């Protein structure tokens, strides 16, 4: 069943992403693996290098943002954005040639969806089975999948923020005895999400992620680690041994 947008748009984008993920250039595959994503994970996620389809996108806003065929992101990493049940709801494009740039396109109804990067729908089955959930900021911080227990799930929120949809999803699907591990960056933004903060304009307390989750009955632990600003940086400094030392796993 196609939940979120028109059949022709979903078919066009699905075909384009499948083509982009097939026969990856060696340098692209090496880049993704070198950033720490396990091979199983990046293949399950359908990460590719965008190849412009021969036909134009049926979505007008996609054409305006990226060109009729996606010419403006040709060769960029293409990362499907899926709902927890595996339906395609958008795409993220990311440069990998040394320049930093990220561009996103979401279907209109994706606003109702908890937009985590992850191995959907496999991750949902693991959550149903009682696995813990580890949430990081960036997609390459998901390298911690190399060291957490196999039964657990690693997800990325694409930044230091948990939406209402994220919280509702976690509260609904996590098992009562499972734990949520907030593993945001070791910077001010990450710490504010962990501890909460006072809004400068309103002077009101803004709840951190642990407090928000605890209010809906979810056990939340803030992951403490050393040796880098974020898991991706720790990976680049020393691979799996550095991650294990930093996280004591």
What is each residue range found by the language model?
Residues 30, 44-46, 76, 95, ...:
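Residue-level preference for alpha-helix termini and adjacent loops
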């Amino acid at each position: 069943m196609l939940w979120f947008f028109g059949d022709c748009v979903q078919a066009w984008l699905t075909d384009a992403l499948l083509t982009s993920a097939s026969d990856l250039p060696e340098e692209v595959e090496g880049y993704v693996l070198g950033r720490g994503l396990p091979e199983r994970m990046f293949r399950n996620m359908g990460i590719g290098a965008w190849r412009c389809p021969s036909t134009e996108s049926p979505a007008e806003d996609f054409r305006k943002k990226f060109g009729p065929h996606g010419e403006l992101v040709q060769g960029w990493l293409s990362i499907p954005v899926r709902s927890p049940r595996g339906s395609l709801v958008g795409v993220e494009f990311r440069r990998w040639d040394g320049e930093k740039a990220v561009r996103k396109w979401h279907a209109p109804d994706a606003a109702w969806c908890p937009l985590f990067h992850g191995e959907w729908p496999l991750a949902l089955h693991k959550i149903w089975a009682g696995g813990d959930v580890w949430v990081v900021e960036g997609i390459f911080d998901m390298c911690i999948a190399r060291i957490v227990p196999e039964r657990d799930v690693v997800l990325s929120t694409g930044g230091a923020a948990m939406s209402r949809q994220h919280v509702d999803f976690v509260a609904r699907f996590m098992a009562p005895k499972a734990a949520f591990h907030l593993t945001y960056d070791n910077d001010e933004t990450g710490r504010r999400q962990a501890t909460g903060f006072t809004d400068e304009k309103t002077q009101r307390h803004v709840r951190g992620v642990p407090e928000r989750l605890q209010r809906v009955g979810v056990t939340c632990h803030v992951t403490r680690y050393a040796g880098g600003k974020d898991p991706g940086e720790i990976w680049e400094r020393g691979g799996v041994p550095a991650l294990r030392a930093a996280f004591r796993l």
